[in-house]
């Protein structure tokens, strides 16, 4: 009896859609789910598909060619560990487990180490694109043993999204947790993109009182230019969607933004690495403060502030917001890729930043036209310290920074919260500052804690008795 080249464990929507994606590329796929009903449901809903159901782990594992390729699409955390433990008794040395869940990269490093010691291969794989991407072609970020990746690369390449130039949106990222780390930073950048767009929306509503139809038209125009991206594209559609009562749906959605924790992971890692991920972290905090709805409503009746005044010429202000949004986006990516560089050095991953930008060009949530500019920047100078220093991005900063400053100044004067736009200005000015007031902080630290300091006019480390 012939055996399958790959099996998928976990038949929730992402696992189901990836299995169907793999099947559509000409493979017969073994499928397994902890609950029998889920597996039966997938088979019943997809008659004629080359999906072969199994109802015991042993039969599932034995149905696969060796070395076995098993894609796990189960709940991250304890669920992943439990799935791995259930598979191990039936695996042979050299078999490959691919974890496609939203897994914390440190867990992937641990699992890679533990499974490698037992003779198994483990590939932690970031998968971006949501339900539709899983079915039609996601962006895929695999990390683990390079030789194991080579054995699964033909399948991953076939199921990945394809960019406009025909390149598949998958590449080997690096050892152990590199793939899941890049996916984590991707999600952090996604948080930043979404909050920047939300602030642009708030400015256009508060400053110009644009209607939903006007907002949709504005975003349509933006999507035809340098802001062209998946998130801008879907946002234009959101503005005009109505509910069953004829109300604009976006206007009746509660203003509390939920999260699944991946943005927080990105910010926590930035703190561990000493990376100033300010814009992305502000986007995480913006979601947190949005969840304080009752407190915000109460505070709105107590705390005073300015009432928003008209922002002036409509076309001029829209263009300023567009420029501010694009430069803010550039700052967000500059921070994210700077963090990737720091992580690559810390964990010895040897990341290829240009290739990472390339696989974000299709399939994933942050796909955008300007990602090619990032790839070009790293092709020109692979060692560039920060994307803001690349010629294209430097020119945009030169041309657009005044618009960003004007928009932030207007927002502050008119009581419109713009935490990520503000963070973009602060980061840009801090990064370009040859001198910062940190000398005073060092003096304070030495004063109360004898933490010492360095001088600009002498070599060495110094301490002063400040009360003498």
From Swiss-Prot:
Pathway per the UniProt entry: Carbohydrate degradation; pentose phosphate pathway; D-ribulose 5-phosphate from D-glucose 6-phosphate (oxidative stage): step 3/3
* Result of altering residue 313 to N: In strain: ECOR 67
For this UniProt record, the keywords arranged alphabetically read as follows: Gluconate utilization, NADP, Oxidoreductase, Pentose shunt
Q: What does this protein do?
A: Catalyzes the oxidative decarboxylation of 6-phosphogluconate to ribulose 5-phosphate and CO(2), with concomitant reduction of NADP to NADPH.
Q: What is the effect of changing residue 369 to R?
A: In strain: ECOR 10
Name this polypeptide is given:
6-phosphogluconate dehydrogenase, decarboxylating
Active site per the UniProt annotation: 183 (proton acceptor), 190 (proton donor)
State the organism named in the record: Escherichia coli (strain K12)
Q: Name one GO molecular function term.
A: guanosine tetraphosphate binding
Cross-referenced SMART domains? 6PGD
